């Protein structure tokens, strides 16, 4: 079981001394329609009336980013080549909020014409008109959090969608011109079996998605499921969570199946057809700079002067 994360704070890391001309931008949208049983992310169920206030604060932070960077003595490239809206459930935002957010982003930063702009979305939770607003704003990649194509597993975990809804969303996204897609799966959901995992892998491959993310379930102690596991209880089907060994075998099977289907593993949890790897995700692995804005977001930016390396303690040398 994973230990609770430290309190969120903005961090600045030395990401190398070479000049970087482009920035990645991560924007946290922490709103959900329901909270998954295993989730301990900085997100929650809030009334729609708070969405606009939150977006206003994010826009303030975008407008103040240059001044903050100058005060912190870090380089903040104005050119942006990747944007990622994570959550939470960013597709809960009303169309006008999506438009306002991207208008402000473009006022403060110079987006490349071919920038990769990703939005995380929960199936079946697009506010009316939001999909059209996303396309109009330039969103060209969507990460759809299916987690399972077996309805009983999804519902047990607190998800609100069905396999049919995932299929409907994929059709509507493609009709809107967004065909650079990722689909998330989680290995280790309560009640998951070898057979049901194969069914989810079959369904994922059948979608033709050019990218997939496969995560092994990690249960935070402070999540509802984590507290139930610690108490030895049965709520949220805690007794049906697969063993660590079973989860590892599911993950290994996913690697085998996805690579056979043409989705090559390019980091621990991500698989893609050649040339369709997530550019924003690669930014993290390549230690390239990014600015995080919003609740629980962090940044990694190059110091204007190289940061001194800490002295090694002789007792540990």
Q: Where in this protein do the model-derived segments appear?
A:
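C-terminal scaffold of the Radical SAM
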Residues: 9-23, 43-71, 76-317
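N-proximal helix/coil linker or "cap" segments that precede and/or mark the start of modular domains
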Residues: 1-6
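Local cysteine-cluster metal-coordination motifs and their immediate loop/turn environment
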Residues: 30-43
């Amino acid at each position: 079981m994973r230990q609770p994360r430290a309190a969120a704070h903005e961090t600045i890391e030395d990401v190398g001394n070479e000049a970087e001309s482009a920035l990645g931008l991560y924007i946290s949208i922490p709103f959900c329609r329901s909270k998954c049983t295993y989730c301990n992310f900085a997100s929650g169920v809030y009334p729609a009336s708070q969405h606009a206030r939150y977006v206003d604060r994010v826009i303030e932070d975008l407008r103040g980013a240059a001044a903050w960077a100058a005060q912190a003595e870090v380089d903040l490239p104005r050119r942006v080549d990747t944007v990622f809206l994570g959550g939470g459930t960013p597709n809960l935002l009303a169309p006008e909020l999506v438009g306002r957010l991207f208008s402000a982003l473009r006022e403060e930063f110079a987006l490349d014409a071919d920038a990769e702009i990703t939005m995380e979305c929960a199936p079946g939770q697009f506010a009316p008109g939001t999909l059209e607003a996303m396309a109009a704003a330039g969103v060209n990649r969507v990460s759809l959090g299916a987690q399972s194509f077996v309805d009983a597993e999804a519902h047990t975990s607190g998800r609100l969608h069905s396999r049919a809804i995932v299929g409907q969303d994929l059709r509507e996204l493609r009709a809107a011109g967004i065909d650079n897609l990722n689909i998330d799966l989680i290995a280790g959901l309560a009640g998951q079996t070898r057979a049901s995992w194969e069914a989810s892998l079959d369904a994922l491959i059948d979608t033709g998605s050019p990218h997939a993310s496969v995560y092994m379930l990690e249960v935070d102690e402070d999540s509802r499921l984590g507290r139930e596991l610690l108490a030895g209880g049965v709520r949220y089907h805690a007794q049906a969570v697969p063993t660590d060994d079973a989860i590892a075998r599911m993950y290994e099977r996913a690697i085998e199946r996805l690579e056979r289907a043409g989705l090559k593993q390019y980091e621990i949890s991500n698989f893609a057809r050649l040339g369709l790897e997530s550019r924003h995700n690669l930014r993290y692995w390549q230690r390239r700079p990014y600015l995080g804005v919003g609740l629980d977001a962090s940044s990694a930016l190059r110091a204007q002067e190289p940061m001194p390396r800490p002295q090694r303690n002789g007792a540990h040398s």
